[in-house]
Amino acid sequence: RGSGKTTLVESILYVKDYIKRKGDVENGTTVSDFDKEEIRRIFSINTSLIPVEHNDIKLNFLDTPGYFDFIGEVVSALRVSASAVLVLDATAGVEVGTEKAWKLLEERKLPRIIFVNKMDKGYVNYTKLLTELKEKFGKKIAPFCIPIGEKDEFKGFVNVVDMVGRVFD
């Protein structure tokens, strides 16, 4: 299983009303994994361009493959990117692919954020994960969202910039 990049893109499309129902990677019903081979393999093998408008600003999301067998897709996407969102699977922590992607972003001096996904799994320890991120990537790691609850008690997050908490339905 991947970190959830395609699922994140699908959720953004759903929240912004571009689609009426969220697709599912395992069912082959997502917007960005439309290639027959991607549907068969149940993971991304090509980069998909997903344009989304937010507050009169057009954001072009490039949903890239997570497996580094397809590193060429990631490198090509970074050539046209102004910034990046690294999606991290909270259940797996910092993986080799995360470190390689970070290195590519460092080489290109691209700004980035890390989106921590799968926080709702029962065995996630946010404090341990944050420590691991800081050990791997140093002072560039600064959380701007902190979870409300951990493990089975995860309910939402607090945005530390505006000090607003959001609890999931």
Task: Place the predicted regions along the sequence by residue.
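P-loop NTPase switch module centered on the Walker A-proximal segment
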Residues: 1-88, 94, 143
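P-loop NTPase catalytic nucleotide-binding module
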Residues: 1-3, 21-22, 90-169
